[in-house]
Amino acid sequence: MKYILILLYVFTSVVTAQPNIIYINADDLGVMDVGFNNSKYHTPNIDRLRNEGMSFTNAYASASNCAPSRACVFSGQYSPRHGVYTVGTSARGQVKDRKLIPIKNTVHLPLEIETLSEVLQAGGYRTIHLGKWHLGMDPTEQGFDVNIGGYNLGGPKGGYYLPIQGQAKVAEFNDDYPVGTHIADVFADQAVRFIRSHREEPFFVHMAYYLIHTPFQAVPEMVDKYGGHRNRWAIYASMVEKMDESIGKILSELDAQGLCDDTLVLFCSDNGAHSDISSQAPHRSGKGSYFEGGIREPLVVRWPGRVAAGATCDVPVMGIDFFPTFIDAAGIAAPKGKILDGLSLLPLLSQSGTIEERSLFWHFPVYLQAYAGKADDSHDPLFRTRPGSALRQGKWKFHEYFEEGRLELYDLEADPGERKNLASLYPQKTTELHQLMQTWRSELQAPIPTELNPKFKSAEN
């Protein structure tokens, strides 16, 4: 806490006005799914943010699927503190394939946990949520003045074009826009209206796109350039471009209102992509996996005059850092007694210093089944991941799986695809990181599944 307070003093002595903050969170967008990392994608507006701001080349989601990643951002805490480990039940996959009884999942972020949006709201910000919430029934219960399209479910199951059926918080705009309007355009229009209405006061815009989550639905005017409607990747790429186009409308409004210099824009994703559709090579696997492809993210921050254009940072960072970063930029102290596991990134953004050296941790004491019939290079044919923990320290990535007590050690510099397990070759480093993991779990009281599942059927049986 002392570290954060010192940063507040130094930074607010230079910047007196609270900046506007726009947090753009893509859904299921992999690190290799943006133009500045992969020229196959057309993302000129995301690329603009990268060219006008700082790109983090070792950025991580705090979890490998939707709800827990978002819970970590808005709580500023690792998963064991809030208990959101997955989406829905923790007992995913066939019961006969699960050796352990998984830890019970907390489906929604508990209301008693003070959120990022609540702290900004109390600090004088006008706040709006647009798009995917997934942390409860109504974002206005957790710090937002306005909610556009956010509720407890993960995506518009019937498609992205109006009229939306059966999902009230999205369908409420069916009568306000022409039939066939894409909901990304609805959200962009609503964000623009909010910015215009509150340009004279600090605002926090949480633009949480449902894109690129399922259902995969081609954008007709964009899909042909990527290979047409029969190509699954082309459909995916057209959705990425549609999101980018929507982002461009928000950036254009900042230009028109003369607000660019007064606005911190952060772009990221909640977890990795569906790797059977969009390869994250050289990283292994994708959404739902704790291999790099499931948790590596594109992260860009633009703040003209405070963040150098075209800058790059290779310090490992993760989603839990957004809470302390945003309140630090706003000159708002962390609430008394509030535990923040992340660090403010302002020293990195301003290139005026660094942050304390640390390890990054993940804890997943539940099961997440593999996508049926799809080879996505994840944990095994049955599960994207099984109960376990992971950490990154420097170049090292360490995994522990609870079913068999298996330990895995990878050198990310030499082996970014996590193919060669070095645990037996480096027993001292493996023991060191295992002990570090155990200490971290003890400090956070992270639950570990130990009860055997009586319905488990091993391969031998």
PLM features per residue range, with description:
Residues 2, 15-408, 416-442, 446-461:
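Formylglycine-dependent sulfatase
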Residues 3-13:
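Sec-dependent N-terminal signal peptides
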Residues 411:
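Catalytic Cys-His active-site segments of thiol-dependent hydrolases/isopeptidases
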